[in-house]
UniProtKB/Swiss-Prot annotation:
It catalyses: a (3R)-hydroxyacyl-[ACP] = a (2E)-enoyl-[ACP] + H2O; (3R)-hydroxydecanoyl-[ACP] = (2E)-decenoyl-[ACP] + H2O; (2E)-decenoyl-[ACP] = (3Z)-decenoyl-[ACP]. The active site is at H76. SUPFAM superfamilies: Thioesterase/thiol ester dehydrase-isomerase (SSF54637). Keywords: Cytoplasm, Fatty acid biosynthesis, Fatty acid metabolism, Isomerase, Lipid biosynthesis, Lipid metabolism, Lyase. This is 3-hydroxydecanoyl-[acyl-carrier-protein] dehydratase. GO terms for cellular component: cytoplasm. PANTHER family: 3-HYDROXYACYL-[ACYL-CARRIER-PROTEIN] DEHYDRATASE (PTHR30272), 3-HYDROXYDECANOYL-[ACYL-CARRIER-PROTEIN] DEHYDRATASE (PTHR30272:SF8). CDD domains: FabA. The lineage of its organism: Bacteria, Pseudomonadati, Pseudomonadota, Gammaproteobacteria, Pasteurellales. The keyword Disulfide bond does not apply. Homodimer. The gene is fabA. Pathway: Lipid metabolism; fatty acid biosynthesis.
Amino acid sequence: MQNACTLNKKSSYSYDDLLASGRGELFGKEGPQLPAPTMLMMDRIIEMNEETGAFGKGYIEAELDIKPELPFFGCHFIGDPVMPGCLGLDAMWQLVGFYLGWIGGKGKGRALGVGEVKFTGQILPTAKKVVYRIHMKRVINRKLVMGMADGEVEVDGRVIYTATDLKVGLFQDTSTF
């Protein structure tokens, strides 16, 4: 992986930084990219490091401001708006992939799986803020760069989703994936 100094690693990232990642400008054209809006599931990353988290192998915390006009509320479900749970899960995968780029990994990010996901609440258009927390468990840096983490999604101070063994890989060639 690249030297951290060449990446200009920061411990937090603005919305504009996240958009730059989606354009391939943050980690370079060979690094992983976040999706662009409307699939980008966070507004900012407020903390990133390689030392803390539940396993002492890295931690990421990001936030999404909830606004009633977010696109999914208009169609999921009509008259009963709720953020699809799969979008919270995807946000956690997005953050694991971002972490792999942040530490210098190269390739296109792809979600590879999750051990277990539990949903114990929901995100409604009346909510104010979603917080994602990712606890890195392991990073493999061989032919395939892969990260494994546990994560949680909190809305307005209450944890509502948990996921174990989130897996994301970085691939040089995705044509046969």
